[in-house]
Amino acid sequence: MAPNLRKSHPLLKMINNSLIDLPTPSNISAWWNFGSLLGICLLTQILTGLLLAMHYTADTTLAFSSVAHTCRNVQYGWLIRNLHANGASFFFICIYLHIGRGFYYGSYLYKETWNTGVILLLTLMATAFVGYVLPWGQMSFWGATVITNLFSAIPYIGQTLVEWAWGGFSVDNPTLTRFFALHFLLPFMITGLTTIHLTFLHESGSNNPLGITSNCDKIPFHPYFTLKDFLGFTLMLLPLTTLALFSPNLLGDPENFTPANPLITPPHIKPEWYFLFAYAILRSIPNKLGGVLALAASVLILFLAPFLHKAKQRTMTFRPISQLLFWILVTNLLILTWVGSQPVEHPFIIIGQLASITYFTILLILFPIIGALENKMLNY
């Protein structure tokens, strides 16, 4: 009998082992779809981004006009730009849901997979930040100024570091040029990290909603999960195209329709919605260095998740108190997101401070305590 090329060819057999004959737990739910959705997001962003880069000019005098030119004069340029801008939002929706899933079902116990995932999140955040600067509108410019300025809070080397990052004494042409270079480079770095992320995942195999070993009940990835993934793609690409075609500027800032002007500061400087939770935590501390540390901690805390797991059961499926705490955390993050979009005045300042304290308390103190408590409850 002739050997099956799919299983014998050196390259095809790697694809086969990770996409076709991969043994997959039969009970993974739709929450396990977000990994493949993130893959589609990455592919879409790289394709639309490449097409946009062909018409973009990374120069302070031309950047804004080149984006306007793309939208007006390039065939379907408006569509490519709208898909790229809103694709970023969907990328973050998917990654936040993916992280939430990992947290709920204890997927962080696969430490290598989890840690590469957190590094992927940080790289994605960096990519989105430098990308937001490129259209060179008011919010692009002032967002870049405010966020890069945070590095000056680092003792001793801070100011030097910021001027080195800027390539001058303020955000200007050198900054825009290097941000474009970085925005082009980072997605390929994300692609490489994704490969590592998947390699680690396939070492252990997927977790499942019950958090128990599923070796006794696995099914091939194709056709079952390929079909399920395609359904997921449809359900994500439909709202993305709807948003890009009907309300492309819904999630953007009106300030960005004004070209960057270093002499006029917008009344409310705020990042895109997906960074608002971290921005709210940054603003809630009335000290520059303290705020920067809290901002960093708000994301880096994810690295601690495996060490804060004290429960005997892996997932929260049968842990009602932890479930309640998890949903309080989700609500808390939504409150932080809302506060981050509001001006710095009376009710919002205290709400932001309370929500920030709650965020760290739940993750660092309450989750381990409740986990240990639920272990005790197993005895009764």
From Swiss-Prot:
Keyword terms: Electron transport, Heme, Iron, Membrane, Metal-binding, Mitochondrion, Mitochondrion inner membrane, Respiratory chain, Transmembrane, Transmembrane helix, Transport, Ubiquinone
Record's protein name: Cytochrome b
GO BP annotations listed: mitochondrial electron transport, ubiquinol to cytochrome c
Note: Heme 1 (or BL or b562) is low-potential and absorbs at about 562 nm, and heme 2 (or BH or b566) is high-potential and absorbs at about 566 nm.
Function according to Swiss-Prot or TrEMBL: Component of the ubiquinol-cytochrome c reductase complex (complex III or cytochrome b-c1 complex) that is part of the mitochondrial respiratory chain. The b-c1 complex mediates electron transfer from ubiquinol to cytochrome c. Contributes to the generation of a proton gradient across the mitochondrial membrane that is then used for ATP synthesis.
Domain of life assignment: Eukaryota
Protein's membrane topology: Multi-pass membrane protein
Family stated for the protein in its record: Belongs to the cytochrome b family.
Signal peptide residues on this chain, from the entry's feature table: none
Entry's localization field: Mitochondrion inner membrane
Cofactor(s) required, per the database record: heme b
Record-level GO cellular component terms: mitochondrial inner membrane; respiratory chain complex III
Keyword Mitochondrion: yes
UniProt cofactor note: Binds 2 heme b groups non-covalently.
